[in-house]
Amino acid sequence: MYIVETLDNLIHQTAFFNLEFGNYVMIAVALFFLLLAIKFGFEPLLLVPIAFGMLLVNIYPDIMAPYGDGGAGGGLLYYFYKLDEWAILPSLIFMGVGAMTDFGPLIANPKSFLLGAAAQFGIFTAYFGAIAMGFNDKAAAAISIIGGADGPTSIFLAGKLGQTTLLGPIAVAAYSYMALVPIIQPPIMKLFTTEKERKIKMGQLRPVSKLEKILFPIVVTIVVSLILPTTAPLIGMLMLGNLFRESGVVRQLTETASNALMYIVVIILGTSVGATTSAEAFLNTDTLKIVALGLIAFMFGTMAGVLFGKLMCWATKGKVSPLIGSAGVSAVPMAARVSQKVGAEYDPTNFLLMHAMGPNVAGVIGTAVAAGTFMAVFGVF
């Protein structure tokens, strides 16, 4: 009898008896993301950990159990998630991005800042769209950053504004659209440009001196942080990583920030973001609204960048390719690669990558500034 009861207890403790239909739906979504990442190569560094975190939390929800529940110590991914909520991991991601980024194209062509700024139009489109859909001001602000296609900044702002219940859907939407940049952007770019404009070649960028590259992160940190102190965690870490790279005197720190530390943070960030997508938290109308708003915002941001690129093309009498305008969103370097790919489709000798990197890295700064602006407006520091 004791053996039968033991077996019965073991059977009823399996996940099969504790999961609901929604959990199986989310498991299917996680497997789909893994398929996209592994078989089709859609940003595997992002989607594999996110999808696996999604898989784990929907099979074993207690992996996200808060500290103190029933006297327990809390689930493993709960502690990972707190690093998101406290804005530690997004800031470290920015340091790694800075250590890997060459701001030379932006320094050589400062007009790229305008294209990066134009692409932020999608953020404010999403903000007013979210307000219209019934979200409160802070929730709308957190959702709107998806329009910049910037996962770390989306997580950072959602945590700072206290929108922790929306952090999962916001982060998954932001990272999903980052991964889908090669699919979403080209049709918009082609819709708003002529074949002649797509064939425009741009002149070689001027050489950028070592002194300029060293001064850039220092000056940007001082200027932006003085104007918007709330941007200091993101801009400061981004520029610190870049200063590691450009100074040339801390090679070990550059390698650590851009490789080992970056990948460790991506693993922890990805799995913890995925773990916020339990069926209960994710399968609701708010999630559908966030996904829709994110897509619309990203499309509007791409469109605004391309249209501003057309304006610059007209103003410079054909010296600027409108295709680099779409790179103003902060999905680095995916958006710049898309500009290169679309341009090469119409002229294989057209090399736009370095020109597109200017607005692309400007978009990273622009999205961080937009997040800092929202924080300042709502009095969050």
Which stretches of residues belong to each language-model region?
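Intrinsically disordered, low-complexity non-transmembrane regions of multi-pass membrane transporters
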Residues: 1-18, 24, 187-216, 249-255, ...
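Hydrophobic transmembrane alpha-helices of multi-pass solute/ion transporters
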Residues: 4-18, 39-40, 54-88, 243-266, ...
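Entry/N-cap segments of selected transmembrane alpha helices
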Residues: 31, 105-127, 278-305, 356-360
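Interfacial helix-loop-helix linkers and transmembrane-helix boundary segments
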Residues: 38-47, 66, 77-80, 100-115, ...
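Alpha-helical membrane segments and immediately flanking helix-loop junctions
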Residues: 86-87, 94-100, 115-125, 129, ...
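Alpha-helical transmembrane segments
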Residues: 165-183, 293-301, 324-327
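Membrane-embedded hairpin module used as a gating/binding unit in multi-pass transport
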Residues: 173-249
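Transmembrane helical segments that form the transport core of multi-pass membrane transport proteins
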Residues: 221-308
